[in-house]
């Protein structure tokens, strides 16, 4: 097992945007022993800073830490989608996992729909691992670890955080607590819905244009919040141009933390600071200065930007 000094050395190495050579397996093994003890609805205390999609935009993650404060000084909650699309998925996910192992009570990392074997084989993480390591071992270590990530989090029993959205199969938090999460993300069903669904202007449940999950209306979100004694659903999963977007009569907020998404969308990013008294403050930020782009052929399909 790596010591704290080993982890500090690894984190310092990763902060320079350098992949770890051979220590990834040990790091993932240690992270698994931590994550297996966490819940499907992981309780989180305030103050905490809530973050949306990162998608391999490593230098923008460093900018996020510059704006929001470094770990462990700031307590962080990340709502998934650490990999794919950006050029530095390996460095991004390795840094977040190393921070989790080093400061387990100061960072919560949830599962997004991209923390999946199938999706990462299409949208970049698998190919990046092959390019940077010469084989798929690191990809396998991380995708095996992804099965253990909590699905949702609950800040002070009031703010419900997850990657995607609600499910017609899940009326209560106890329904979510009863799921068996330690598996590849299924193509359908409640676990899939939590990672894939989106809020919609239309009431009720709808068919998702993504081909997985559902759309859910303001009536659904309001009922879920009322049933479970919640003040807010905080989620990520969708590009919003200002970095955050209130919807569904303020029952739902979307947070997106990858500025200039895919290096071309022109959006701002945001994070949400939840204070000691549950007060809410959004911090917006622009992309970090562009680095020299790696020589990568961009063949990944857009699916949903």
From Swiss-Prot:
Mn(2+) 1 binds at residues 53, 55, 81. Pfam families: Metallophos. This is Serine/threonine-protein phosphatase PP2A catalytic subunit. SMART domains: PP2Ac (SM00156). It catalyses: O-phospho-L-seryl-[protein] + H2O = L-seryl-[protein] + phosphate; O-phospho-L-threonyl-[protein] + H2O = L-threonyl-[protein] + phosphate. Binds 2 manganese ions per subunit. Signal peptide: none annotated. Keywords: Hydrolase, Manganese, Metal-binding, Protein phosphatase. Belongs to the PPP phosphatase family. PP-2A subfamily. GO terms for molecular function: metal ion binding; protein serine/threonine phosphatase activity. Its EC number is 3.1.3.16.
């Amino acid at each position: 097992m790596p010591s704290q000094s080993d982890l500090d050395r690894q984190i310092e190495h990763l902060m320079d945007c350098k992949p770890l050579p051979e220590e990834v397996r040990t790091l993932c093994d240690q992270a698994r022993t931590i994550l297996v003890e966490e819940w499907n609805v992981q309780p989180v205390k305030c103050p905490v800073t809530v973050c949306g999609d990162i998608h391999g935009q490593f230098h923008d993650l460093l900018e996020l830490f510059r704006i929001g404060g470094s770990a462990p000084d700031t307590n962080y909650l990340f709502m998934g989608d650490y990999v794919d699309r950006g050029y530095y998925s390996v460095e991004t996910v390795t840094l977040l996992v190393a921070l989790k192992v080093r400061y387990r009570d100061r960072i919560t990392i949830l599962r997004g729909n991209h923390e999946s074997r199938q999706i990462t084989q299409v949208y970049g993480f698998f190919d990046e691992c092959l390019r940077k390591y010469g084989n798929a071992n690191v990809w396998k270590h991380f995708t095996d670890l992804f099965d253990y990530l909590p699905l949702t989090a609950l800040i002070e029993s009031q703010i419900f955080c997850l990657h995607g959205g609600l499910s017609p199969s899940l009326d209560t938090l106890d329904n979510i607590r009863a799921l068996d999460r330690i598996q590849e993300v299924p193509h359908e069903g409640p676990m899939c819905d939590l990672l894939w669904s989106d809020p919609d202007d239309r009431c009720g449940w709808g068919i998702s244009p993504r081909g997985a999950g559902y759309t859910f209306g303001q009536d659904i979100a309001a009922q879920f919040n009322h049933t479970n004694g919640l003040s807010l659903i905080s989620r990520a999963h969708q590009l919003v141009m200002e970095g955050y977007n209130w919807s569904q009569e303020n029952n739902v907020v979307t947070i997106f933390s990858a500025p200039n998404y895919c290096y071309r969308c022109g959006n701002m990013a945001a994070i949400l600071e939840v204070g000691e008294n549950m007060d809410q403050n959004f911090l917006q930020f622009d992309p970090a200065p562009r680095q020299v782009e790696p020589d990568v052929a961009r063949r990944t399909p857009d699916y949903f930007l």
